[in-house]
């Protein structure tokens, strides 16, 4: 997004504004208006050091989003899509490599632009014309599809499984899911310090859960399990078509990789909240690679553990509760074994806390610049210096996605819908990085450098993930009870909706209203951020 760096007008500003402008640099953002509420006024955003995130907190913020429902739930869909133990494991390794490629791209952008907002800032830096178009597309994807529905639903399924009721994605599981996201939103909005403390604790906890699964898997390989040896590693790379798995073709491999990417999602989480990170350049460059590297190793070993204890047909049909089936097959059906899925549910809760924390900050960043209708409300930090309004927006979308699908299997569909548009956004981000690296007039510099082969590999992977889901799968047009084309069409539709929103926002509404809003963002010497909103008539010189 091209930004006007001329000083804001002093029209309507008093002595306080003049003193403010003497102390700070300003960044004027000419924005259309949506309603008649906004007057010349200011909002201030300030966080003391106790609220800022250090290296440990940033690492756990990444871990909490990465280690969530994915590794405990998606291995079922991965194997069902490929029909091969060896290929499934290779896809998990490939997913880890692609994650490191994406991390490198985001480190280069994030260390050069250490502000909250993630991809919003990177797209704005590259795609400056038409003005605001890239931002509007990202806004549509982040607000409408940046939900915590899959994580919350998995929490509900594991709670029910632990209680002895193995129920599909029906209304009981969805009701518990709504309670889960409601708790997360209220905690972050009303007790923000405790929200950070809890997801730090759960970050440690879920690492131990994964380590416990890995160690239990080695025990299962040694013969310590309650079922006969499933022999899953015999001729591991054979492509099979069995009861509920294999034979899906290129479409199946694309959706399998999408679900693996979903499981690795979270490596970019700290980029969303860099404005609340201590010494962001140092913190991000240390916390992100350590968290991603450790998680990748644990993911591959956890999948080996699952294959050591779960027969192929049972794994393919286990859907969300893969880890629950694993515990039952290794430890039996005792009350103690049934309690183990509760620990996975708590891990899922940590993921919901991390996702809602980060996505609410992105929503708030969009609102701070006047990009949302009624932006002043969504940007508010009332009442406890936390983005309760933006958290509420995240809650609304999450609940809608939870209750919208018909009763029955919904988890895989929600995962695909959440992950797919990100392939387009990430593709544009990495393509933009390649462009500004080689366009000398861009004067691009960053403390981190991503080499061209890494960028090209990441770009090609995202093109594959964006295009192949439109190819009909082998053996039928329905996947998990939904037509195969639903999630890619909905995903692309949401991105196109961002273009429609851009046209309304930049062209239609200013003409109808006759004026626009100018949002001037200021950063004080003490780190406080002040945003002043002013009405400006269309065609009026500032």
Feature locations, PLM:
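Membrane-interface "cap" regions at the ends of multi-pass membrane proteins
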Residues: 1-82, 99, 510-542
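Helix-loop-helix junctions that connect adjacent transmembrane segments
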Residues: 12, 20, 25, 46-49, ...
